[in-house]
Amino acid sequence: MKQLSTKVTSNGHGQDSSYFLGWEEYEKNPYDEIKNPNGMIQMGLAENQLCFDLIESWLTKNPDAASLKRNGQSIFRELALFQDYHGMPEFKKAMAEFMEEIRGNRVTFDPKKIVLAAGSTSANETLMFCLAEPGDAFLLPTPYYPGFDRDLKWRTGAEIVPIHCSSSNGFQITESALQQAYQQAQKLDLKVKGVLVTNPSNPLGTALTRRELNLLVDFITSKNIHLISDEIYSGTMFGFEQFISVMDVLKDKKLEDTEVSKRVHVVYSLSKDLGLPGFRVGAIYSNDEMIVSAATKMSSFGLVSSQTQYLLSALLSDKKFTSQYLEENQKRLKSRQRRLVSGLESAGITCLRSNAGLFCWVDMRHLLDTNTFEAELDLWKKIVYNVKLNISPGSSCHCTEPGWFRVCFANMSEDTLDLALKRLKTFVESTDCGRMISRSSHERLKSLRKKTVSNWVFRVSWTDRVPDER
């Protein structure tokens, strides 16, 4: 053991988190409608499988892109050779325009300021290497994605200081919470280098308000620190509201091309909006030339393959397709989210009101034996081992209040979701709290129209996939 590095022998990866342990339990006994109908249903995977049919249809109509051809001629040899790690200009242009389209074309993205990375995991870590020394800190609002403990800290040596948010205001970021987190970092003798937020939020399923974004920009301006806005769920908005990017706020405040804009960085990915986590496509957008230059050099450790760039540049350049896709994706996400919420309500369970994402932030505080995180983990174990549903406990997301859980809804068929909700309802009704819930109060709920989405992807083994899905 003495011959190994501390990264190997330490527990900095966070693999013992209940977030990852739930995945491991699922892999031991995965649900299958025919082969294993009593198996565990995966509701801890933030994967978007609702619109695969649209992409498959596009591939059928565009065989050249899928077959690595140009004007009917194979370009296999061209794509098989070493690529420029700056990325293909055509693909970066298509990515920039797709990001603009998601934001209603209110803001623009310069392709030259985009750095490609093998997913948002790589993009976020690269930014940490660019912005922080080992021991420096970033402030993150809670609850936050459990993988950040690995992505931001494990190899970089950076620290995370939580910005404590509460259910009293829907877990929104407040000025007092920001100041308290900053002061806590100072007490710990940590140099604060910036704030990182996910917008829309994982795990809350809510987009940051304009007020919160204004507050964040004002805060990092006053402290002379950085702001990273992880916007990988920006195309999953399904409410009436438009997605507001931090880039919108910079434009509204007339801070474009200022020193402040050089300290605001956006992370994006095609894993959630297009449902392509296996393609490993992420990006950093920064107005700081030094960041772009350094991150581009670092990207050689996690490139996006030239074959992937060629295929997706063709897909994203088809404006008719992207417009129709984003609209239909929004409709299907909204329908699926409503189905989950309705099913939970029939079991006497409510959620934080959400307008984005592939999951709901579910309130099960009334099912806890005591108001403690120990009771939360006890409830989680019952749901995992007895009900056979893998969901993510709030404690794995550093939530300050026990009893909240992240439940995903876009990685399964409607029939599987209905079965999961049936199992959960049966469990709740078997508890003392469940027996007190009046069933008559739920008779007013209207059933949602079913939508069938075919060709659900068979879950590959835990050992065969990179465990960084959000």
Swiss-Prot record:
Modification N6-(pyridoxal phosphate)lysine occurs at: 272
The cofactor(s) it depends on are: pyridoxal 5'-phosphate
Enzyme class, spelled out? lyase
| Residue sites binding substrate per the record | 47, 85
**Which SUPFAM superfamilies does this one have?**
PLP-dependent transferases
Q: Which reaction does it catalyse?
A: S-adenosyl-L-methionine = 1-aminocyclopropane-1-carboxylate + S-methyl-5'-thioadenosine + H(+)
Do you know what upregulates this one?
Answer: By indole-3-acetic acid (IAA) and cycloheximide (CHX). In response to low dose of cytokinin.
- CDD domains on file: AAT_like
Q: Which Pfam families match?
A: Aminotran_1_2
Per the record, the GO terms for biological process are:
cell division; ethylene biosynthetic process; fruit ripening; phloem or xylem histogenesis; response to cytokinin
The source's superkingdom equals Eukaryota
Which UniProt keyword terms apply here? Ethylene biosynthesis, Fruit ripening, Lyase, Phosphoprotein, Pyridoxal phosphate, S-adenosyl-L-methionine, Ubl conjugation
Say which family it is in. Belongs to the class-I pyridoxal-phosphate-dependent aminotransferase family.
Function statement? 1-aminocyclopropane-1-carboxylate synthase (ACS) enzymes catalyze the conversion of S-adenosyl-L-methionine (SAM) into 1-aminocyclopropane-1-carboxylate (ACC), a direct precursor of ethylene.
Name the PANTHER family for this protein.
1-AMINOCYCLOPROPANE-1-CARBOXYLATE SYNTHASE 5, BIFUNCTIONAL ASPARTATE AMINOTRANSFERASE AND GLUTAMATE/ASPARTATE-PREPHENATE AMINOTRANSFERASE-RELATED
Put simply, this protein is called 1-aminocyclopropane-1-carboxylate synthase 5
